[in-house]
From Swiss-Prot:
Pfam families: Bgal_small_N, Glyco_hydro_2, Glyco_hydro_2_C, Glyco_hydro_2_N, LacZ_4. The active site is at E465, E532. Its EC number is 3.2.1.23. GO terms for molecular function: beta-galactosidase activity; carbohydrate binding. Keywords: Glycosidase, Hydrolase. Coiled coil: none annotated. This is Beta-galactosidase. The keyword Methyltransferase does not apply. InterPro entries: B-gal_small/dom_5, Bact_Beta-galactosidase, Beta-gal/glucu_dom_sf, Gal_mutarotase_sf_dom, Galactose-bd-like_sf, GH-type_carb-bd, Glyco_hydro_2, Glyco_hydro_2_AS. Residues 29-48 are annotated as: Disordered. One of its GO terms (cellular component) is beta-galactosidase complex. It comes from the Bacteria.
Length: 1007
């Protein structure tokens, strides 16, 4: 309730002035409370279906007015709504044909359209007039009833059967109203006027699609005459974390004599752990159960207990409620956070509630997929950015085991950060403005009241990117007093250190690893977390290892990658981003920052995260295993290990399951069983993998959680076999032999024909390539401008010389080129061709005269598009780059060429590192590319780099050829952020340095 409208006095008339008054943010709402579940009988509890809840989800009626001028008195019982349309609840209006979705990040949706300041709202304020008819379930007829909106964006006025019910604004926590006196048994008419904008919109400037509607469930809640209104359960550990203590605070609607209760604590098997019975004499019930024989809760071992509270009147059960709890202690001691006595490291990701088809009306299936995929990727923590999620998500995090930062629905980014990152908090809200205190504080209170019993929530966050001020200091003070069992967080104070005390954590966004290390090595007073880091936009997350290496510092307690899922909306079978809906202003593709794609398929970045976030650190060296157990509560004997031996990519040996017992935090070196391998047999890979010993809720027995390998490298070297026939003509050099013919143009300096078994494989002239289709990080770092001279340098290379030399077992064709970029010498390519049609290609880049970076160096080949399949031996199975090799392992992999194109917004993709050989083929045959004494980077795609860079969406690309890019090297992809940070120097290519590409091209004969 606001400080303007007295809570004890019911308001009977709606007032549109509330939309622009920051001191009115809820009217006639009941106090926020815990999200426990209540049932009318033991049978209902066991079935999980409550007759005390009536869903109003489904088809509603709607009138949508873009200009905010809806039908007058539409809430009246006798209003004719026959012309209203149908709409789904829960759902976002903009995805159902009412208005358009708009994506903006920092700027407000009205920026440039209207010059307004807080708490003003745009004159164009879309209004959705919702209507729902329903009959009241019989179980409700003799009970008090509340009406609950779990999520509504942004401001709602509510009427029932013509009576004004109330008003609510906080989009992401419930607005709940008592409606008993307005209800009828049949033909009830519920009306909701939902406005897209209100003063609350200044506090909801999150980086997401701006969409409105009743996007979470709407329900009726029946309340028996004995009813649990609110339940606070503080489940902690005592006796060196071996025993449990449960502090119970229950608020009971007490309207009957001779009332009593029974509280049970039951384990996951349903066995009784503890019990307490007693009379109910007041609305407050408080007691403590001590010395409970419980197992601790953690993400590794999410042991849950069910608390059941039975309410009786004269011995008859009127209501039973349940709440899952986990017993755990989360403490801040000497500037370090501990869970159950162990220093914790958050290996986390930020996560928006998002579904490519449903917007923010996400499903249980979405949540379970996210959580299971996180667990399988060694992610142990999630930040609910930047608002409280559906209650179900926290229950699932409790169950599966994820640590959670729960964050209040408060972001006012655009009120203080301006173009270019310039800070101007002149009209920042809430800041120091006490007019915004009530609304801001209510958002924290609503979140904490609802979510307080969830074991997974370790940290309360005041909000996101809203600068600082006295309001945040007051909010922080409330949080710490209301809940000393958790730690309180707010990153915004980094912009105004006057309010440093408004957070218990030193939390920063996108700080480079070296900057973080400076903090960690200078007597840190607080624990450090990177609350947003490793910006995963497009082809990104390079050098994540620089951050995970900081875990050696006790005060470094991990971070949360930005972010989990791309926010691409599906339309006509395509995933679209900002601007594609004619939404202006917009921040375009900046909504595509996910470790998983918008359709919930995994991106190649996720394998890298899994490898670096693993709690089992494996290293194979000299045939031995170095093992570090970074689990907090799990012995490494809970996993089994396999050793595997691969020769030239083929598995030749695998051990029986092995067990290595290390306590949490311990390290050890173990001898491994390996068979003898003859030196001449080829390249040998010694691999160790760690696997789950038993089924877990998120993965089956045998699932691989970590792996490492040692390579006894043995790269192939070209050895010519016989000399081809040479035809030295005026315009061309021809080389031919049994079933092959190669033609070199003396005018162009390139091979213009490559035929094996009569089939032409060269569809266009080869070209040098020094470029790649710019990644999102490249664009943000300014590489398009800085390195533009390399984009077409290869395309416009000028032939200087071509010559031919006949050798005993081969023929050499030598070419020299100049570039429109000053080089230290000639750019040369030598082709050594033998009598079997094998071509050893050596391309030498002499280095540029000018200092700077080189994106890549190699050759582009356009091959027949019919070569649709690949098979290779190298790092895989995912694309990889010099700063994102982790999570890929040497082996033989195969698939369809089109699958090499990762569905980012079109940019560099598909590179395979440390390639030994790569085959492209169809049913008729194909080509094989082989490394020649040096590592090879190679990609095979249906599109060229030029096509990719020119396209805004993958569906715009056309497949004319199969394009091969064979590279000696390519710079890393970076990922510290996507708006300025460069690729780390050790993963860049110095343009002044000479480079050489060596590979062999030969026919692939299919048996």
């Amino acid at each position: 309730m606001s400080n303007k409208l007295v809570k004890e006095k019911r308001v009977d008339q709606a007032d549109l002035a509330w939309l622009t008054d920051p001191e009115v943010y809820e009217v006639n709402t009941i106090p926020p409370h815990s999200d426990h579940e209540s049932f009318q009988s033991q049978e209902e509890l066991e079935e999980g279906k409550s007759s005390l809840v009536q869903s109003l989800d489904g088809d509603w009626l709607i009138d949508y007015a873009e200009n905010g001028q809806g039908p007058v008195n539409f809430y009246a019982e006798d209003f004719d709504d026959s012309n209203f349309k149908s709409v789904k609840v829960p759902g976002n209006l903009e995805l159902q044909g009412f208005g358009q979705p708009q994506y903006v990040n920092v700027q407000y949706p009205w920026d440039g359209s209207e010059e307004i300041f807080p708490p003003q709202i745009p004159s164009k304020n879309p209004l959705a007039s919702y209507v729902r008819y329903f009959d009241l379930d019989e179980a409700f007829w003799d009970k008090e009833v509340s009406l609950k909106f779990d999520g509504a964006a942004t401001a709602i006025y509510v009427w029932l059967n013509g009576h004004f019910v109330g008003y609510g604004e906080d989009s992401f926590t419930p607005s709940e109203f008592m409606v008993t006196k307005f209800l009828k048994k049949e033909n009830n008419r519920l009306a909701v006027a939902l406005y897209k904008y209100s003063s609350a919109s200044w506090l909801e400037d999150q980086d997401f699609w701006r969409m409105s509607g009743l996007f979470r469930s709407v329900t009726l809640q029946a309340k028996p005459r004995l009813h649990l209104e609110d339940l606070k359960l503080t489940a902690s550990l005592t006796d060196n974390y071996q025993k449990g203590k449960l502090e119970v605070e229950a608020n009971i609607a007490y309207r009957l004599p001779n009332a009593s209760f029974k509280l049970e604590v039951r384990d996951s098997e349903g066995d009784l752990v503890a019990e307490k019975l007693g009379p109910i004499r007041s609305e407050q019930l408080e007691f403590t159960l001590a010395d409970l024989p419980v197992a601790a809760w953690s993400a590794e071992k999410p042991n849950l207990y069910q608390v059941r509270l039975y309410l009786y009147q004269a011995g008859s059960l009127l209501e039973v409620s349940r709440q899952e709890v986990g017993f755990r202690n989360f403490e801040l001691k000497d500037g370090i956070m501990y869970l159950n006595g162990q220093r914790i490291v958050f290996k986390g990701a930020n996560r928006h509630e998002f579904d490519s088809k449903l917007g923010r009306a996400i499903t249980e299936e979405d949540m379970i997929w996210d959580i299971k995929t996180m667990k399988r990727s060694n992610i142990n923590a999630v930040r609910c950015s930047h608002y409280p999620n559906q209650s179900l998500f926290y229950r699932l995090c409790d169950k599966y085991g994820l640590y959670v930062i729960d964050e209040a629905n408060l972001e006012s980014h655009g009120t203080w950060e301006k173009v270019g990152g310039h800070e101007d908090p002149s009209f920042n809200v809430p800041g120091d403005d006490q007019h915004w205190l009530g609304a801001s504080l209510s958002r924290v209170k609503n979140m904490m009241a609802r979510d307080k019993n969830h074991a997974s929530i370790l940290i309360w966050s005041l909000g996101n990117e809203s600068y600082a001020g006295t309001v945040f200091a007051q909010m922080a003070d409330y949080v710490r007093k209301a809940d000393p069992t958790r730690v309180q967080h707010y990153e915004g104070v980094t912009h105004n250190r006057k309010f440093d005390d408004a957070t218990q954590i030193e939390s920063r966004m996108y700080a480079p690893a070296k900057v973080i290390e400076e903090y960690l090595t200078n007597k840190p007073a607080k624990p450090f977390i990177s609350v947003e880091y490793a910006h995963a936009m497009g082809n990104s997350v390079g050098d994540l290892a620089a951050y995970t290496a900081l875990e050696k510092y006790p005060h470094y307690q991990g971070g949360f990658i930005w972010d989990w899922i791309d926010q691409g909306l599906e339309k006509d079978g395509h995933l679209l981003y900002g601007g594609d809906f004619d939404d202006r202003p917009t921040d375009y593709e900046f909504c595509g920052n996910g470790l998983v794609f918008a359709d919930r398929t995994e991106s190649p970045k996720l394998a890298n995260v899994k490898a670096l976030y693993a709690n089992l650190k494996l290293e194979v060296k000299d045939g031995q295993l170095f093992l570090k157990n970074d689990n907090l509560f799990t012995n490494s004997s809970s996993y089994y290990f396999l050793t595997s031996l691969l020769v030239d990519g083929k598995l030749t040996y695998q051990s029986r399951p092995l067990t290595f017992g290390l306590e949490p935090g311990e390290s050890g070196t173990f001898a491994l069983p390996w068979p003898e391998v003859a030196d001449e047999k080829g390249e040998v890979v010694y691999r160790v993998t760690a696997h789950l010993k038993e089924d877990l809720p998120w993965a089956d027995e045998g699932f691989t959680v970590a792996e490492a390998e040692e390579v006894a490298q043995k790269l192939p070297e070209f050895k010519p076999e016989g000399r081809p026939d040479l035809v030295d003509s005026d315009y061309n050099l021809g080389l031919k032999g049994n079933n092959f013919q190669i033609l070199f143009s003396k005018v162009k300096g390139w091979p213009v024909s490559l035929k094996y078994a009569g089939r032409e494989y060269l569809k266009r002239l080869p070209e040098f390539t020094f470029w790649r289709a710019l990644t999102d990080n490249d664009r943000g770092a300014g590489y398009g401008y800085d390195l533009a001279r390399w984009e077409n340098a290869g395309k416009y290379a000028r032939l200087k010389d071509i010559s031919c030399e006949v050798k005993e077992d081969s023929v050499l064709v030598k070419t020299a080129f100049t570039l429109p970029v000053a080089l230290k010498g000639d750019l040369t390519v030598t082709y050594e061709v033998d009598g079997r049609g094998k071509i050893a290609v050596t391309a030498d880049f002499p280095g540029a005269e000018e200092a700077g970076l080189l994106p890549a160096f190699g050759l582009n080949l356009a091959l027949p598009k019919e070569l649709t399949d690949y098979r290779y031996y190298g790092l895989g199975p995912n694309e990889s780059y010099p700063d994102r090799l982790e999570g890929n392992y040497l082996g033989i992999y195969q698939g369809a060429v089109k699958k090499n194109f990762s569905p980012y917004r079109p940019q560099e993709t598909g590179n395979r590192s440390k390639v030994r050989w790569y085959q492209l083929f169809d049913e008729k045959g194909g080509l094989e590319f082989t490394a020649n004494g040096a590592d090879l980077n190679l990609s095979a795609l249906p599109y060229s780099a030029a096509q990719i860079e020119a396209a805004d969406h993958a569906f715009e690309l056309t497949n004319n050829y199969t394009w091969v890019r064979a590279l000696s090297a390519q710079m890393g992809v970076g990922g510290d952020d996507s708006w300025g940070q460069k690729v780390h120097p050790e993963f860049c290519l110095d343009a002044q340095k000479a480079r050489q590409l060596r590979l062999v091209i030969q026919p692939l004969l299919l048996k």
